[in-house]
């Protein structure tokens, strides 16, 4: 079968895991299972829903340190699982930076967290109360975060240069 990357295309998948609200360990395993499934079908990029590691409806639990630590652990589990895989994954979780809570999309590739992009426009109507819990990333300067075991870019204006090497000619993919 011919690789579509040779024609400038990549196969992108959108995956929705069956999650348990607040059970970050279970949700991370489900995300890893789906990542394997789409990877086996040839996807080179997979996007998961916002806050998929914790669940969207955690409300005030988003501020609990136990939840935030579990979400980070789930993110690391997913990142470690991706090592050796030629797939870019985007997953959602709550993340505290500078004392503020953000709803972020984490970009994972080959075992590493490449960066996090905070949500800029937070709905605050009907059943959506995101502004109650999260801070908008709209005016946030892009920076480089140092965690205890990794570093990554954080902000809304990030460009990643990732090499997809499993094709006949290595291709650079700019993810904006």
Show which residues each predicted segment covers.
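Extended interaction regions within the primary functional domain
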Residues: 2, 12, 124, 162-165
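Accessory alpha-helical/coil subdomains and C-terminal extensions
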Residues: 143-163
